[in-house]
């Protein structure tokens, strides 16, 4: 055997050996992971845990007696950096103010949570719902009725999250 053919033979043998060893290492890793518990969630059926501070779909809350919490102070409208909130209010016979129009443009909203922090009566909150995809842009213009409906649907989860989050405010 000549010197170059010997080198070629050794390189070929070494390359085959490394390929085989690496292949075996890959099989070992694959077998190891095959018998470990799975970390993937099957999303629509299983959902991962949400942080108590998660900011999702907006909702307007009511008091336990059914009265709206919003006192039309308009702090949320003023503090909103995206100018996504529009409020119109009128005074009632008893002297208190209530909203006649409360609109949120969810397309503009940046989910910063400033509206929730500014509200003195916890009327506007960002709930736990993150699945609110729509087919048209118009469906993302939330009016007062839609926001109140969200509040009724998610009230238990919202109250629990606010209770968990209370020490941090």
Swiss-Prot record:
Protein family (similarity comment): Belongs to the complex I 23 kDa subunit family.
Cofactor: [4Fe-4S] cluster
Assigned EC number: 7.1.1.-
Protein role: NDH-1 shuttles electrons from NADH, via FMN and iron-sulfur (Fe-S) centers, to quinones in the respiratory chain. The immediate electron acceptor for the enzyme in this species is believed to be ubiquinone. Couples the redox reaction to proton translocation (for every two electrons transferred, four hydrogen ions are translocated across the cytoplasmic membrane), and thus conserves the redox energy in a proton gradient.
Enzyme class: translocase
Binding of [4Fe-4S] cluster 1, residues: 70, 73, 76, 119
Keywords: 4Fe-4S, Cell membrane, Iron, Iron-sulfur, Membrane, Metal-binding, NAD, Quinone, Repeat, Translocase, Ubiquinone
Residue ranges annotated for the 4Fe-4S ferredoxin-type domain, each copy included: 60-90, 100-129
GO function terms (MF aspect): 4 iron, 4 sulfur cluster binding; iron ion binding; NADH:ubiquinone reductase (non-electrogenic) activity; quinone binding
Self-association state and partner proteins as the record states: NDH-1 is composed of 14 different subunits. Subunits NuoA, H, J, K, L, M, N constitute the membrane sector of the complex.
InterPro entries for the chain: 4Fe4S_Fe-S-bd, 4Fe4S_Fe_S_CS, NADH_quinone_OxRdtase_chainI
Cofactor notes: Binds 2 [4Fe-4S] clusters per subunit.
Protein name: NADH-quinone oxidoreductase subunit I
């Amino acid at each position: 055997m000549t010197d170059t053919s010997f080198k070629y033979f050794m390189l070929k043998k070494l390359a085959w050996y490394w390929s085989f060893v690496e292949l075996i290492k890959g099989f070992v890793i694959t077998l190891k992971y095959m018998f470990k518990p799975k970390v993937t969630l099957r999303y629509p059926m299983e959902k991962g845990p949400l942080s108590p501070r998660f900011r999702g779909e907006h909702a307007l809350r009511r008091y336990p007696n059914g009265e709206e919490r919003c006192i039309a102070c308009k702090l949320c409208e003023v503090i909103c950096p995206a100018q996504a909130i529009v409020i119109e209010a009128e005074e009632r016979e008893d002297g208190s103010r209530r909203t006649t129009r409360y609109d949120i443009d969810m397309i503009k909203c940046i989910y910063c949570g400033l509206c929730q922090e500014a509200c003195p009566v916890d009327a506007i909150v960002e709930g736990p719902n993150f699945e609110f995809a729509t087919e048209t842009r118009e469906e993302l213009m939330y009016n007062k009725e839609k926001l109140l409906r969200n509040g009724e649907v998610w009230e238990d989860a919202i109250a629990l999250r606010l209770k968990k989050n209370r020490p941090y405010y």
